[in-house]
Amino acid sequence: MSCILSVETSTDVCSVAVSQDGACIFEREDHSGPNHAVKLGVYVDEALSFVDSHLIPLDGVAVSCGPGSYTGLRIGVSMAKGVCYGRSVKLISVPTLELLCVPVLLSEQIQEEDALLCPMLDARRMEVYAQLFDRSLKEIRPIQADVVDHETYKSYLDEHPVYFFGNGAEKCLETINHPNAHLIKGVEPLAKNMFPLAEKRMMNEQFEDVAYFVPFYLKDFVAKSPKKLL
């Protein structure tokens, strides 16, 4: 097994964690808002000081690669690449929507064998970034930017119980309005949940090119005009 530093900045939550042999040995989280530019460097420095003080060699850095916040992803990936350069370790990317599934599966809330998981990240209005998986994390439908109405997932809901979660899910459930639609609240993409996915990629040598890797934004960045002009 390996020692992996994990970085997650795809939403307003900033989190950093370290795993050794698959167990979390260090974690830091900030839920106060999009403070990645302020918090992330501090948390990463603390994590690296922790592994150094315990004489634990770092084997890789895992980073949530998107989709999600354009600015957050850019900050997280830049930090991860910097550590990889500085420490000469491997870079591992973990898809954000797949990461969201980990705490749901670990909680064992889903009992139906044919259940589907639908992690959602809020985009804007009734739009979400969403993907569908079965309970083994096999992809059933690829990532899409969905403008949600009552027909969006109907073909899946007519055949399966579907569990929706993530920061885009709650606003959609009333619109989806189907007896097979279930909401799981409080699920966030966190660095401490990245380890099972990162370890698997480490074992399979699924590494990214540190020089050329970029986040998966799904959609182009759209700049917002300020509400007030000075």
Language model features by range: what are they?
Residues 23, 35, 90-189, 217, ...:
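Surface "functional belts" at beta-alpha junctions
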Residues 1-65:
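N-terminal beta-alpha supersecondary unit
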Residues 31-39, 70, 74, 78, ...:
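Residues at secondary-structure transition points
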Residues 62-96:
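DPxDG-like acidic metal-binding loop motif
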Residues 140, 184-230:
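Acyltransferase
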Residues 51-58, 85-94, 110-112:
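Phosphate-handling active-site elements
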Residues 47-51, 86, 104, 191-202:
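Stable alpha-helical structural segments in soluble proteins, enriched in small hydrophobic residues
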